[in-house]
Amino acid sequence: MLNPNNSATASEVVEIDKGLKSPSGLTYRNGDLYVAAISKILRYKDIAATLNSSPEPETITDKLPTKSHHGWKFIEFGPDGLLYVPVGAPCNICEPEEVFASIHRMDVNDPDNTLEHVARGVRNTVGFDFDPVTGDLWFTDNGRDAMGDNMPADELNHVTRIGEHFGYPYIHQGDTPDPEFGEGKNASDYTPPTQNLAPHAGAIGMAFYKGNM
């Protein structure tokens, strides 16, 4: 939406692209627009200068899973300059392949599209941000269904080292074994939440306040 006259409402709507599957992730860096669909991430170079000329996207990667259950990809650049990409579990509760239930990061200029695991055991995060002081990654995670109305809690988690495992599908809310996958698992082997949130709250966003209040 464009507002060249600085009026109260946008005066023009420009279609940048179409036919994408669930393009839910958007971020902007150095003049380029990045869009994440279910299985791919696209870059629209110098988007402000090419809006009116049907910009042709560059495919950053098309190697993301095609599963649509928890398949939306919310993306953001970290303070390290890498693009962070969550890949949710393709189910309510299951023991998925390694690429799922994780947060990854990647160099958008890497021709091999290499994904690095940042966090594992993450069922479905759709909200994450970086501490403006330390640069640490924080994220919310939505807990599984079908364990009752009052459990498990949704979670607020803090990544303190690359590759940490936050429990899914074995341990929920830091201390509760899963009835299907938790047998023989110890809660102490996984990183507990920094804060438990209300069960089934669906915490779908978070951001650090950067004002002066």
Residue ranges and their predicted role:
Residues 72, 90-92, 101, 105-112, ...:
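Beta-propeller domain segments
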Residues 1, 35-36, 84-87, 139-141:
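Residue position within the beta-strands of beta-propeller blades
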Residues 23-46:
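Hydrophobic or amphipathic alpha-helical targeting/insertion segments
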Residues 24-27, 76, 129, 207:
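Conserved beta-strand position repeated across blades of beta-propeller domains
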Residues 2-19, 45-66, 98-127, 181-199:
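Blade-edge beta-strand/turn elements of extracellular beta-propeller
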Residues 30-31, 80-81, 134-135, 211:
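Short coil/turn segments that connect the beta-strands within blades of beta-propeller domains
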Residues 1, 32, 40-42, 102-104, ...:
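A short loop-to-beta-strand structural motif that recurs across blades of beta-propeller domains
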